[in-house]
């Protein structure tokens, strides 16, 4: 036994899959202020003020805007944070996710 009596090592290839990714979207409504949407984008999604303003305008003009693409757990957490903060502030802001 050339390896000093140790068993021969077996190499096992694990299949590594990329995590499923989800796009997080904000939806326009007639009550949530533009300022609140910008603050959500800055605080929850870590967008710069310029990026947040651009996304907010897309939400306002097109009815929906993309906040970012995240793994499932991160996306779900961000959606929950948006809904909790919006409800606490009295806004009906809707945030959804869709698989990429």
Swiss-Prot record:
GO terms for biological process: protein catabolic process; proteolysis. It comes from Nitratidesulfovibrio vulgaris (strain DSM 19637 / Miyazaki F). Gene3D superfamilies: 3.30.1390.10. Pfam families: ClpS. InterPro entries: ClpS, ClpS_core, Ribosomal_bL12_C/ClpS-like. The gene is clpS. Signal peptide: none annotated. Belongs to the ClpS family. This is ATP-dependent Clp protease adapter protein ClpS. Binds to the N-terminal domain of the chaperone ClpA. The lineage of its organism: Bacteria, Pseudomonadati, Thermodesulfobacteriota, Desulfovibrionia, Desulfovibrionales. Involved in the modulation of the specificity of the ClpAP-mediated ATP-dependent protein degradation.
């Amino acid at each position: 036994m050339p390896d000093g009596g140790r068993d021969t090592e077996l190499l096992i290839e694990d299949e590594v899959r990329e995590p499923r990714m989800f796009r997080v979207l904000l939806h326009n409504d007639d009550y949530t202020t533009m300022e609140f949407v910008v603050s959500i984008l800055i605080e929850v999604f870590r967008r710069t003020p310029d990026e947040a303003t651009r996304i907010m305008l897309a939400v306002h003009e097109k009815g929906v805007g993309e906040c970012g693409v995240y793994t499932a757990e991160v996306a779900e957490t961000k959606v929950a944070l948006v809904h909790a903060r919006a409800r606490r502030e009295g806004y009906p802001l809707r945030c959804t996710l869709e698989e990429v």
